[in-house]
């Protein structure tokens, strides 16, 4: 997809660095980094590992490359204006081998053909799934969907 392989490897290895960390520790890392969570973020602990992960990688590992940090930060929600690296990490996480959901195989095949269409399909699935279960939808996911639809 034209991304930097070294950055992709780094972001790929580190994107879930805080996933198995206790939520209170994640909150501490975010607080110490000066991150104020939105109301939607406060209500969805599943998003915390991405936010705290980017903060941890910056403060504890000393990685300051904004593209890598943003790929980690937005790998769960996406966002408008995603870089190639952000797109790669987002869809790689979404289609990883352990992910099982209705349509997973179709999406995994689509990513081999068209990154944009795969991201749109992933975002569509996420938005429908969350809305169908009465869960909040992060504004960044909606912005990512609209941006991909309008600008590719």
Language-model region placement:
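C-terminal beta-signal and terminal closure region of outer-membrane beta-barrel proteins
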Residues: 122-127
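Charged phosphate-binding loop/patch that engages nucleotide di/tri-phosphates or the phosphate backbone
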Residues: 128-152
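Divalent metal-dependent catalytic cores for phosphoryl transfer on phosphate-bearing substrates
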Residues: 1-121
């Amino acid at each position: 997809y034209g991304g930097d392989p070294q950055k992709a490897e780094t972001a790929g290895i580190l994107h879930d660095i805080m996933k198995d960390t206790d939520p209170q520790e994640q909150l501490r890392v975010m607080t110490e980094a000066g991150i104020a969570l939105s109301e939607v973020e406060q209500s969805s602990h599943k998003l915390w590992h991405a936010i705290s992960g980017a903060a941890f990688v910056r403060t504890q590992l000393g990685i300051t490359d904004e593209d890598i940090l943003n790929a980690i930060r937005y790998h769960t929600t996406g966002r408008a204006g995603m870089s190639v690296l952000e797109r790669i990490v987002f869809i790689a996480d979404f289609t990883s081998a352990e992910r099982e959901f209705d349509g997973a195989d179709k999406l995994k095949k689509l990513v081999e053909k068209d990154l944009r269409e795969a991201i749109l399909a992933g975002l569509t699935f996420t938005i429908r799934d969350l809305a169908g279960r009465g869960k909040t939808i992060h504004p960044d996911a909606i912005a990512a969907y609209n941006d991909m639809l309008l600008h590719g």
